[in-house]
Amino acid sequence: MKLLIMGPPGAGKGTQAEKIVKEFGITHISTGDMFRAALKNQTPLGLKAKEYMDKGELVPDEIVIAMVEERISAPDCAKGFLLDGFPRTIPQAEALDKKLAEMGITLDGVINIEVPREELIERLTGRRVCRQCGATYHVKFNPPKVEGVCDACGGELYQRSDDSLETVSNRLDVYEAQTAPLKDYYAKTGLLKNIDGTKSIEEVFASIKNALQK
C-alpha cells in the first residue's frame, strides 16, 4: 500500500498517519523526520539542504525529491509507505509523479482530511501549554481543572506564539494558497479520497479504511 496523506494544520493528520501505518504495516515518511535524519547522518543531500536552511531559504524541490527517492528506496519501504508533508505544491506533485514513474511505483490513494476553517482555528488557538512541565491542554476539548493552571504540576498555562490567531490564520492561508490546489490535481487521477475530519479520531480512521477498500 503506497499512500499520500494531506490536510490543513489542525486536521489531525499526524494522529491518523500513526494509525494508518500501524494498520497496514507500512512505513511513515514524514518530510520533517526525513530532513532531521539526513542532517543528523550528514548525508550529501542533507548537507545540501542544510546550506539553504541555514540561510532561512526553502530547500529547492529537486533536493527534496532526491531525498524522497532515497527514502522510498530504503528496504523498510518495500511493503509500502505513507508520504506525509510532501508534495505541498503542484510543481512538487508533478515532479513526484515523474520520479515515482521512473521507479516503477504507483500510488494507491491520496487521503485528504477536510475540516472547516472555523473549526481548525478553534482547535489550534485553543491549545495551552504548561510553562513548567510542558503538558498540553485545550480550552474546549481538554481543559485543566482550574483555568490557566496545570493539573499535573500547578504551573502556569500559556498560549504559544505558534497558536495565536494571527499565526494560525497565516498558516491556513498558506495552506489554502499552495496545497489546496493539489485536491483538484489528485482528483483528476481518481486517487483522491476526501475524508470528513470533524468526527472522532476512531470515526475518521474508519472512514479512511473504508475509502481505501473501495
Curated annotation (Swiss-Prot):
Gene Ontology CC: cytoplasm
Keyword ATP-binding among UniProt keywords: yes
Region annotation (LID) ranges: 126-163
Any single GO BP term: AMP salvage
Record's catalysed reaction(s): AMP + ATP = 2 ADP
Region (NMP): 30-59
GO molecular function: adenylate kinase activity; ATP binding; zinc ion binding
Subcellular location: Cytoplasm
UniProt pathway: Purine metabolism; AMP biosynthesis via salvage pathway; AMP from ADP: step 1/1
Positions of ATP binding: 10-15, 127, 136-137, 199
CDD domains: ADK
Function statement: Catalyzes the reversible transfer of the terminal phosphate group between ATP and AMP. Plays an important role in cellular energy homeostasis and in adenine nucleotide metabolism.
Domain remark in the UniProt entry: Consists of three domains, a large central CORE domain and two small peripheral domains, NMPbind and LID, which undergo movements during catalysis. The LID domain closes over the site of phosphoryl transfer upon ATP binding. Assembling and dissambling the active center during each catalytic cycle provides an effective means to prevent ATP hydrolysis. Some bacteria have evolved a zinc-coordinating structure that stabilizes the LID domain.
Protein name per UniProt: Adenylate kinase
Taxonomic lineage: Bacteria, Bacillati, Bacillota, Clostridia, Thermoanaerobacterales
Gene assigned in the entry: adk
